[in-house]
């Protein structure tokens, strides 16, 4: 077993300080641009596990390598202005922690008739999004935003490489994935027609609210980009689990060897075929789970296929 299996395990605790960040605390009557200074503090901890297995059975040689890492950080200090409510502070949260409203279902006729809906600062209609009033003042505003979901930077990452060689044939593949990560659907993918002259995405057609789909709808009723309540407000409605597993690369080939190759002045010749981004398993579906919010409204990740010939003289 010892000659086939190897690996390593690392556990780390890191306390970073003097991080360059912008000052935020100043009297309200001072109209100046706050300086960037070395005052930030962030604690990090986590582990990395690497395992490797190599084995040969006659002419058949194979290997499997895997790695798994987990890293979590916490903002210890970032010079925040005093907040009225504890859920508004970024201090104590992870770097890249999303903040937003908590989606509390879609407005119904019964909600409107009851008169008990918090003031969302617009004329709500059935099918509009409604949010939780965290501070109980009966008004939905910035004081009702709180940490939601996981950070935008994955806390869990993993990868697997595997392959074999057998009498000139070779095969290899690479899988990668991440977990405990969230992504906001970008604004251009929330608003019908992208807020302009773009297409209507299939998920919008399938999931939007109508009186007939009120019990199963996953997105608000169709309305324009001006409806900030439904589309612009970041909330748990638009925050998605961006965990994924992706087959990043597969390659298969055959290497020719033999005395006959000397006659054509070749040491060896290899033909191969490869593919990239062939499979992805994820919850996001409508965008690349690896893409940050601002990159989602771009050309999607492509499958790539290659056929090649290597000649060694």
Identify the meaning behind each predicted range.
Residues 110, 115, 172-174, 181-183, ...:
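Short helix/loop capping segments that flank catalytic or ligand/cofactor-binding pockets
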Residues 151-185:
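Glycine-rich, aromatic-lined ligand/substrate-binding cores of catalytic
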Residues 1-100, 230, 234-313:
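Extracellular/periplasmic, surface-exposed regions of secreted and cell-surface proteins
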Residues 37, 54-152, 214:
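Conserved small-residue
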Residues 21-25, 46, 132-140, 219-229:
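Active-site-adjacent bridging/hinge elements
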Residues 16-17, 127, 150-152, 180-182, ...:
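A short local loop/turn or secondary-structure capping micro-motif enriched for an aromatic residue
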